[in-house]
Every structure is written in structure tokens, then in C-alpha cells.
Amino acid sequence: MYNCAILLAAGEGKRMKSATPKVLHKVCGKEMVNHVIDALREANIEDVNVIVGKKAKEVQLKTESRSVSFSFQEQQLGTGHAVKCAKEFLLGKEGNVAIFTGDAPLITSKTIKTLMEYHETNGFHGTILTSIIDNPSGYGRVLRENNGEVDKIIEHKDCLKEELKIKEINAGMYCFNIQALLEALDKLDNNNAQGEYYLTDVIEILKKDGKKVGALAVNFEETMGVNSRLQLAEVEAIMRKRINAMHLENGVTIIDPNNTYIDCNVVIHNDSIIYPGNILQGKTVIKENCVLYPNSRIVDSIIEKSVVIQNSVILQSNIGENTTVGPFAYIRPDSNIGSAVRIGDFVEIKKSTIGNNTKVSHLTYIGDAEVGERCNFGCGTVVVNYDGKEKHKTIVGDDVFIGCNANLVSPVEVKDNSYIAAGSTITDEVPRGALAIARSKQINKEDWVKKKDEK
């Protein structure tokens, strides 16, 4: 059976109080609307149409890479009107259409599959996704017939006293037979106080036409929508719990899951240990046997096997196996750190390559540089890469020893097996095997202090 989907993503989200369209707010590193699209795709629904409205271009820009189509809702005239705007998408199709909202990122592919199968197996023309909650106040109630099929949906304000006791609510997600939906949409009107077209009225139309309507009850958290920053935080907490549980099941030790923040696209291999306060974002990959001590942030980076990181920031970079980083190191984008390297405290690396077995132990800046293997950077070494207009490159060969408080003024090359004396400012090439000394000769003025005090 052919299945397609319509995704409602045209709402303004005024309660978010944000210039960003509501559906583009991120949950664990991914836009809410893209969470739903990805769940639909995992449920084998490839043909997805996204309804966009105000700030349509922003939503299109963030979703078009997922090969979806778009329909436009220029005026916000209700959920039924939004689906009416997608009629062109539905015309000529036979099968079923799932309708979901772009602000409900917790929906899973498993639930979507179950909904579609339940709808088709029972021969329903429409199926509502519902939840049963202890406090249904404010939600539309689902009334069922004796055979379990849906009789109608009643909004909270229209419920009678007995109907208010019903705890099954409409989750605002549906599956329809496409032809039955198109026929119902043609009969949909806006004869109500708000002058809007409601998708819930389609259920009433189907029932009047003698069509079968079913309901599938699922866990409430999967259907949670986001209309405020508070709800966004609640949804993020649930998603984070899911993500951390997945990593725990896959053999990762997370010392305190409630205080560990891992984006949905992060990959962590088994036998790694994550301490509290770590933030892993983007497409970061943590290989086997790594230890992330508390309070590091790693973004879009690849961390190879057996790396130890403490209290550091790593952005868009690669860290080789058996390397240690931190505490308080800053690895900036486009850096490649080799294997068995030591990047110590208060070290900043920017757009540089550091060779295997090199040690940069403390208080050092390396920018726009190529550093070879088995080098040692003394405390306070600075690569002076910026002349006020342009960045320049520094090349340091293999087996180079740089003393404390040295400056390498770019562009400059320090060749293999050479030494730089402490306190030197290097502006010219250092030959292979040479000792470079670039500092003033020490002068001791005898009795200088006594003479100063006598003045």
C-alpha cells in the first residue's frame, strides 16, 4: 500500500517569542521538523509534503536537503485549511496519508509504522492518534462507540460533565485514506466562532458519510507538542534521556545521564566513559576506550581510540588515538592532532596539524602551523601568525625542541632536529640540527640597587 505524509509546519509559534520559526528550534541538535521527517523516513514513508507559511524560505532551507516537497499556507486559517493547501500534493494518489505536526519531535518511527498498519489492517478511512492522560484539561476528548471505533472528538470547552471525565485525548496526528480525505476536505467549512477550518471536523464528516474512523492510543510523551520555551525544555529532557539510554545500552558508561548532553547525531563507541557536564554536539564521533572527564564541549569532531579529555573545548577537529587533551585546552576548527600527543593546560590550537608523539604541555598558542612528530613546545611558546592583515603559516619539522617563552614569527620554518633557546623570538629559518638563539645577551649591573636607593 502506498503511504505518504503531510507535515504541518506553517504555524508562527508566537508563544516562543522568537524570530526563529517554531519548527526550526532544535531539540538535541536537530530542528524539530527534521526529527519528524526523519521518523517518517525511518517508517518507510518517502513522499513527504511540508506545509509552510510565514518565513517559509527559512523552513525550506533547513528541510530541502531531505528531499521533501512543499505546499504554502499564506493565511493561517486552521489545521484543516493547512491540509487543504496540500490538495495538489494528494490529487492523483491512491493509498493513505499520515498527517503530523512539525512541532512534535518525540514521535518515533515505530509508532508511525504501527499507526499506518493499524489503519490499513482495520480498513479505516481515518485513524486518530490518541493518548490517555491523568489530567486531560484543555484537550479535545475522543468519544468511542461500543465497538471501539471513534464516534466524535469534542473540544474541552464543549464537553458535558460526564464527557469531561474522559481521559483519552486527541493527539492531533492522523492517518487517512487519501480519497476519503479529499472528499471530506471539499465539505469542510469554517462555520465557527473563529472562522477557521478544523481538521477535527473531517472526522465528523467521515462519520456522517458512514465511513469507519478508528483511534490508536500511544504514550503521551511521543505526541507532546512544543508551543513555549518551557515545553521545548521538557521535550529536550525526554529526548536527551532517550539518547543517553541508547548509548548506555550500546556499551558506553555515562556516569550521570541527567547531567550529560549528547546530540542525536553523535556516535560513541563502546567502552568509552563519559563523566558529568560533557556536551557532545553535531556529528561528533567518540571511538572506543575514550575517557571524557567532566565539563568538556566537543562539536563536529572525531576522537580516535583511547583519548583522554579534561575540561576542554574541541571544535571541528580530529584527535588521534592515545592522545591526552586538557585540562582547559582549546582546539579550534580544522585542527588535526596526531596519536600519542600531549595537549596540556591552557593550550590553544587553531587550524594546525600536530604530529604524533609531540608534546604541547602548557600555556601555548599554535595557529596556522604544521608541526612534525616528537616535538616539544616549552611553556609559553607562541606562534605569531597574524601581521594585522593576514594569517601566515609556520612549519615545524620532526624532533624539534622549543624552549620556554619562545615566539615563532610567521611565516617561518623550523627544520628537523633543531633546538630553539628559551626566550627567543624566531623570525628566520632555523636549519636542520641547529640551535637558534634570538635574545639579548644578559647584562648584570653590579651594585645597581644600592646606587638607585642612594639617589
Swiss-Prot record:
InterPro entries: Bifunctional_GlmU, GlmU-like, GlmU_C_LbH, Hexapep, NTP_transferase_dom, Nucleotide-diphossugar_trans, Trimer_LpxA-like_sf
Pfam families referenced in this protein's UniProt entry, alphabetically: Hexapep, NTP_transferase
Keywords attached to this entry: Acyltransferase, Cell shape, Cell wall biogenesis/degradation, Cytoplasm, Magnesium, Metal-binding, Multifunctional enzyme, Nucleotidyltransferase, Peptidoglycan synthesis, Repeat, Transferase
Cofactor annotation comment: Binds 1 Mg(2+) ion per subunit.
Keyword Ligase: no
Residue sites binding Mg(2+) per the record: 103, 227
Catalytic activity, as annotated: alpha-D-glucosamine 1-phosphate + acetyl-CoA = N-acetyl-alpha-D-glucosamine 1-phosphate + CoA + H(+); N-acetyl-alpha-D-glucosamine 1-phosphate + UTP + H(+) = UDP-N-acetyl-alpha-D-glucosamine + diphosphate
Binding site for acetyl-CoA: 385-386, 422, 439
Keyword Nucleus: no
Region annotated Linker, chain positions: 230-250
Biological process, per Gene Ontology: cell morphogenesis; cell wall organization; lipid A biosynthetic process; peptidoglycan biosynthetic process; regulation of cell shape; UDP-N-acetylglucosamine biosynthetic process
Cellular component GO terms, alphabetical: cytoplasm; membrane
Listed EC numbers: 2.7.7.23, 2.3.1.157
Molecular function terms from GO: glucosamine-1-phosphate N-acetyltransferase activity; magnesium ion binding; UDP-N-acetylglucosamine diphosphorylase activity
Binding site for UDP-N-acetyl-alpha-D-glucosamine: 8-11, 22, 73, 78-79, 140, 155, 170, 227, 332, 350, 365, 376
Pathway(s) per entry: Nucleotide-sugar biosynthesis; UDP-N-acetyl-alpha-D-glucosamine biosynthesis; N-acetyl-alpha-D-glucosamine 1-phosphate from alpha-D-glucosamine 6-phosphate (route II): step 2/2; Nucleotide-sugar biosynthesis; UDP-N-acetyl-alpha-D-glucosamine biosynthesis; UDP-N-acetyl-alpha-D-glucosamine from N-acetyl-alpha-D-glucosamine 1-phosphate: step 1/1; Bacterial outer membrane biogenesis; LPS lipid A biosynthesis
Subunit and interaction comment: Homotrimer.
Xref: NCBIfam families: glmU, PRK14354.1
Similarity annotation: In the N-terminal section; belongs to the N-acetylglucosamine-1-phosphate uridyltransferase family. In the C-terminal section; belongs to the transferase hexapeptide repeat family.
Protein name: Bifunctional protein GlmU
Organism encoding this protein: Clostridium tetani (strain Massachusetts / E88)
